[in-house]
Design a protein with these regions (language model features):
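Catalytic core of carbohydrate-active enzymes
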Residues: 1-171
């Protein structure tokens, strides 16, 4: 079955916005891909991958981690006005959509949603690199302006992977 954005005319604007957001995540995604190539850690993963000591994530099937630090809780129910989200224990979580409101992990919260929502929560201690300039393709465009989102937790380090996009000169 072919599923292209233009096949869903009523949702085309929402799909476009999601695609543009995905391109803004290119620096974060590229760094996660580099990490995956070195460690074998999946880029998109079940919560249990990182939170094995939290039994509440064992049965969670709709929330997932994007990279190590972004919890995504897609809106999957048509017409939903709220979404319950379990935030894994052991750290704090910052709500991407609510001015980085901080929540303690180990609890289920209920947040307002619309079809335009992509509920995302940033793990404390994360540094998320995003493109500030609008990218339209992964091949032809390059990040020229970088925006860092920091979810506080004392002193933290992160790795931002970048290369020329063409050669293996980085080795």
């Amino acid at each position: 079955t072919v599923t292209e954005p233009w096949m869903f005319r009523g949702s085309a604007d929402l799909i476009r916005d999601a695609i543009l957001l995905r391109y803004r995540f290119t620096p974060y995604l590229y760094s996660a891909e580099y990490n995956a190539s070195k460690t074998g850690a999946p880029i998109m993963r079940a919560l249990v991958y990182d939170f094995q000591d939290d039994p509440n994530v064992y049965e969670e099937s709709f929330e997932f981690l994007f990279g190590r630090d972004i919890l995504v809780a897609n809106v999957i129910e048509e017409g939903a006005k709220t979404r319950k989200v379990y935030l894994p224990a052991g750290c704090k979580w910052y709500d991407w959509s609510d001015k980085m409101r901080c929540y303690e992990g180990g609890q289920t919260i209920e947040i307002p949603v619309t079809m335009a929502s992509i509920p995302m929560f940033i793990r404390e201690g994360a540094v998320i690199a995003m493109a500030d300039n609008q990218l339209m393709t992964m091949e032809g465009d390059h990040t020229t302006d970088l925006h860092l989102i920091v979810a506080p937790k004392g002193t933290v380090t992160t790795t931002l992977y970048d290369d020329d996009g063409v050669t293996n000169d980085f080795k």
